[in-house]
Curated annotation (Swiss-Prot):
HAMAP family: A_deaminase (MF_00540). Pfam families: A_deaminase. This is Adenosine deaminase. Belongs to the metallo-dependent hydrolases superfamily. Adenosine and AMP deaminases family. Adenosine deaminase subfamily. Its EC number is 3.5.4.4. The keyword Translocase does not apply. The record marks H221 as: Important for catalytic activity. Zn(2+) binds at H12, H14, H197, D278. Binds 1 zinc ion per subunit.
Length: 333
């Protein structure tokens, strides 16, 4: 189901949601952190989704053990490097790694700006080693409040040339996008792109708000757009992309099952939607699974899957020249 003549992308992939269980075990031992289990087999139920979670917040708790072992900036650098290695193993040509440095820093009071620098270093080294192209998207974790988001923003701005876009994720119900208008104004002033998690836990109004108030060029998840025909029309007309994450939306109980997922409808409506993983380490999936298992189960035809793959590159925060070069590189292989 993957067209090998086209670039394979994953543009909604959380770096801090893709920490290998084996790495969690090793870092736990290295830093004498008490884990809920002492073997890989018994640890996995604590760090991966085994059965669908009742809601998004419950799903997010599965990420916590991964960041609890980030006891140093070297640990942050390691997981960033391993994210690129994992992308290469999956056959990805281009990834956009979203990460929340405040969340990664929290357990051991690491300097937030230092985490950003460590992630940049690890990703850069990974790209050099494995030949994958990657860009970094800074996440403000609204779950932790406006002040914490401000701290994350300042850390990103200190490395503005290595950050491609700003994202907003976390508890959308408790912390609506309206609290973060000034943050996104500064992001635009820095020349960054804007993508926002919306229409996942909250309804279609959260997507409208992300577009109108925060200036979103893309929407993360966006499943609730299906409830608003005018919104779907607007997304199609304005070519505002939806970063679809099929398995994730089932595991968070945002959508009942893959057959009910709106991605097929979005594509039929002319919306620029792509296939992505979200938190592959926590979900126990990879991009190959999303294309070959999840997408057909969601009712997508072979041609629709190919269109979603094309959309992934079209939506990517790359220049026209970078996209052309990537297409030519893949076609030449």
């Amino acid at each position: 189901m993957i067209d090998t003549t086209l670039p394979l992308t994953d543009i909604h992939r959380h770096l801090d949601g893709n920490i290998r269980p084996q790495t969690i075990l090793e870092l736990g031992r290295q830093y004498n952190i008490l884990l809920p289990a002492q073997s890989l087999e018994t640890l996995i139920p604590h760090v991966q989704v085994i059965a669908n979670e009742p809601d998004l917040v419950s799903f997010l708790t599965k990420l916590d053990w991964g960041v609890k072992v980030l006891a140093s900036l070297d640990a942050c650098r390691r997981v960033a490097f391993e994210n690129i290695e994992d992308a290469a193993r999956n056959g990805l040509h281009y990834v956009e790694l979203h990460f929340s440095p405040g969340y990664m820093a929290m357990a051991h009071q690491l300097p937030v700006a230092g985490v950003v620098e460590a992630v940049i270093d690890g990703v850069r080294e990974g790209c050099r080693t494995f030949g994958v192209q990657a860009k970094l998207i800074g996440i403000m974790s609204r779950t932790f409040g406006e002040a914490a988001c401000q701290q994350e923003l300042e850390a990103f701005l200190a490395h503005r040339d290595q950050i491609t876009a700003l994202d907003l994720a976390g508890d959308k119900l408790g912390f609506p996008g309206s609290l973060f208008l000034s943050h996104f104004n500064r992001a635009r002033d820095a020349g960054w792109h804007i993508t926002v998690h919306a229409g996942e836990a909250a309804g279609p109004e959260s997507i409208w708000q992300a577009i109108r108030e925060l200036g979103a060029e893309r929407i993360g998840h966006g499943v609730k757009a299906i409830e608003d025909r005018a919104l779907m029309d607007f997304l199609a007309e304005q070519q505002i992309g939806i970063e679809s994450c099929l398995t994730s939306n089932i595991q968070t109980s945002t959508v009942a099952d893959l057959a009910a997922h709106p991605l097929k409808t979005f594509l039929e409506h002319g919306i620029r939607a792509s296939i992505n993983t979200d938190d592959p380490g926590v979900q126990g999936v990879d991009i190959i699974h999303e294309y070959t298992v999840a997408a057909p189960a969601a009712g997508l035809s072979r041609e629709q899957i190919r269109q979603a793959q094309i959309n992934g590159l079209e939506m990517a925060f790359l220049s026209a020249e970078e996209k052309r070069a990537l297409r030519e590189k893949v076609a030449a292989k």
